[in-house]
């Protein structure tokens, strides 16, 4: 299965039990910042933004004072799981990033999708990839 298939079929799909509700954007990005696959709507990000995200996974709390930036959008960092999940909020939407052994799984959402639904979709795929040794 291609990485694009994971994005299209497992991240940008209808949320279970909520037909028509789906993430706004999604991607799978290597730890080095290389894009493995992304939705057409995923923002163009700067290398320093990806570096900041990777630093926060290695040094939890790094992004808390400045916020998480992706594609020029600033998200307020909210509760996550140190070294495993970063969550951010901006207005009625937000972002979830799950770290696997080799990649970062990104999901960006806006209402009516809820933070919990985004977490479920992104972390579900991330956990699956971890189980596969990825």
Curated annotation (Swiss-Prot):
A motif (Involved in PIP2 interaction) lies at residues 84-100. GO terms for cellular component: cell cortex; cytoskeleton. Coiled coil: none annotated. Pfam families: Profilin. Keywords: Actin-binding, Allergen, Cytoplasm, Cytoskeleton, Disulfide bond, Phosphoprotein. Phosphorylated by MAP kinases. PANTHER family: PROFILIN, PROFILIN-5. Binds to actin and affects the structure of the cytoskeleton. At high concentrations, profilin prevents the polymerization of actin, whereas it enhances it at low concentrations. Occurs in many kinds of cells as a complex with monomeric actin in a 1:1 ratio. Belongs to the profilin family. This is Profilin-2. It comes from Olea europaea.
């Amino acid at each position: 299965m291609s990485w694009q298939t994971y994005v299209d079929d497992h991240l940008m799909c209808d949320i279970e039990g909520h037909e028509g509700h789906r993430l706004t954007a999604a991607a799978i990005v290597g730890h080095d910042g290389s894009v493995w696959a992304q939705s057409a709507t995923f923002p163009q990000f700067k290398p320093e933004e990806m570096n900041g995200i990777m630093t926060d996974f290695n040094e939890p709390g790094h992004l808390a004072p400045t916020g998480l930036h992706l594609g020029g959008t600033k998200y307020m960092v909210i509760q996550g799981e140190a070294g495993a999940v970063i969550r951010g909020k901006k207005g009625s939407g937000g972002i979830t990033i799950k770290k696997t052994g080799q990649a970062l799984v990104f999901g960006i959402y806006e209402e009516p999708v809820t933070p919990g639904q985004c977490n479920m979709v992104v972390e579900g795929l991330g956990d699956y990839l971890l189980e596969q040794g990825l």
